[in-house]
Amino acid sequence: ASEDGGRGPYVQADLAYAYEHITHDYPKPTDPSKGKISTVSDYFRNIRTHSIHPRVSVGYDFGGWRIAADYARYRKWSDNKYSVSIKNMRVHKHNSNRKNLKTENQENGSFHAVSSLGLSAIYDFQINDKFKPYIGARVAYGHVRHSIDSTKKITGLLTTSTPGIMSGVYKVLRTPGAHRESDSIRRVGLGVIAGVGFDITPKLTLDAGYRYHNWGRLENTRFKTHEASLGVRYRF
């Protein structure tokens, strides 16, 4: 331990692995919402992904309690999904002409936790001169962007062997339930922190930590992250 009891300002740099759970309350195909019916699939309503990102912090160590401000920026998630189904509508017995309906669904979605600016209060447990487990609480101002573009196209197809009649499209039905949405939202959320610090030198500490954060109610979106991180903390 140092002569000043470990007190003083510090900086910390971490590399974090984040598990991200994103839930969107988009209108459902079977549940009209405000007169609109959505074609958004469950895949884009309930997203589970992960990312690796850096995090930087500045704080002050009071010799037991610490306060810290941190900043992180996450990786953007995006994906698309295409599906097609063909339904037989009618077969003419006398000439075997067949009418089918072809339904195509195209979805493009993205989600980006643009930034998180947090303030934490942390308590270090003094186990010995080297190891210091800790727990803490965090409040953060987060900024997220998300978008969805979901469309459905229904096409009538005619298959025929009748001379003089060509197979092909016989009608295109009105596209039902297209859903397009793009939001940029800022909210305050709450989280918890836990981990352990190992003093390499009196001023340099290796830090292994975990944090859970609920980003709050983001309009029609809920966002939660679990993060495991490894970093170093230098006290001046």
Swiss-Prot record:
Its main location: membrane. It holds the Pfam family Opacity. Keywords: Cell outer membrane, Membrane, Signal, Transmembrane, Transmembrane beta strand. InterPro entries: OMP/PagP_b-brl, Porin_opacity. GO terms for molecular function: porin activity. It comes from the Bacteria. The keyword Membrane applies. Residues 1 form the signal peptide. Expression of opacity proteins is regulated by the number of translated repeat elements CTCTT, which code for part of the signal sequence; the protein can only be synthesized when the number of repeats place the start codon in frame with the rest of the protein. Implicated in a number of adherence functions. OPA proteins are implicated in pathogenesis and are subject to phase variation. Belongs to the opacity porin family. This is Opacity protein opA50. It comes from Neisseria gonorrhoeae. The gene is opaC.
